Amino acid sequence: MDSSSPQSLVDLAPALRLLVLALALAALPLSWWWLRQRGADTRTRLLALTALTLFLTFDLIVFGAFTRLSDSGLGCPDWPGCYGEVSPLGARDEIHAAQTAAPGGPVSWSKAWIEMIHRYLAMTVGVLTLVMTGAAWLARKSVQSSLPLPLSPWWPTLTMLWVGVQGAFGKYTVTLKLYPAVVTLHLLGGLVLLVLLAVQWAALRQQPLSLPQGVRRLAWAAAGLLALQVALGGWVSSNYAVLACAGFPQCNGEWWPAMDFGTGFTLLRGLGEVGELAGAGARTVASQVAVHMAHRLTAVALVLVMGMLAWRLWRAGAASKGFAQVLAALLLAQVVSGLSNVVLGWPLIAALGHSAGAAGLVLLMALLLARSRPAAAAVASPPLQWSAS
């Protein structure tokens, strides 16, 4: 591509080559899965494939956080390739020209590779969900149909379609130049994908967890509050409001600083600059403080609710003590990494750990809720069927 020509934000020229690359990349984990599961029954094979996809999806979410935190989201300013190429190797001249024109800008050799590796991993997950879907539908028609799978094939089908939605969010994250609402939706969409896979893995594993009704209600309440907190965390990150409050427990030396919630939570606006006062959608210091404080205050409520949940799970019986221990450990890690972001000035390792911990909490809560059954009904685990099937 001529580096002097205008750069199209959407360049589908490398799409076919990227598809071939995605198939090649996915062939590596799929080959490993197939070799290990050759003699297994249908349910065990699908369980292993779901676990593999779940593992890579968690990695994708963490690497996506690294892409965002390292300011690499526009390392390749077009989509789906990099300056119309499959990899930064073919776009050396364009990357060099962009970096020379703006040395402190969003494009550099390392950022281009970070962004493209994120896309490669996303494509690999997409192929795996496609294979999951095909395997689930084939299993439904196999000779083992007399022993039906504890999972409707519509679940992996929905998962595959959701990967397509995530791809669209990824595209608009780039083409709309890190539009905060799109960046936040992309982050939340990745976590929805994680939840979908976790629910399917739990259904295939068939290990129901008996819990008192009160504990289950508390778990659902904690999950709802966690969803709100994750959304607020995504909004803090996409608006670069992490450092809006210096110090803890006070914010900039005040218990209740000046805050502009109206501007801070104006969703339909582009990415502004700190201190820009013109226009209702611009991010002012007060609006960033409002975003930060909303996340901080919700964190206090979440720690209390999840701390109570961990205690109730510990007392509910031996089967749920493992969940209680992991929940308490993740909660403590989130508090430490969150405080480190503020006190230490947002170091990359703390910010990345905080994002990974949030994904870990979402995964844990999804598994807990997917496995939990009322105490009197947890003897058997009924198949997880699609409501419309």
Predicted features, each with a name:
Residues 196-218, 363-389:
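A juxtamembrane structural motif centered on a specific transmembrane helix
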Residues 1-41:
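Transmembrane alpha-helices
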Residues 42-59, 152-159, 209-232, 320-329:
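Interfacial segments of alpha-helical transmembrane regions
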Residues 136-157, 310-327:
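Membrane-interface helix-loop-helix junctions at transmembrane boundaries of multi-pass membrane enzymes
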Residues 2-7, 63-76, 161-187, 236-250, ...:
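Interfacial helix-loop-helix junctions of multi-pass membrane proteins
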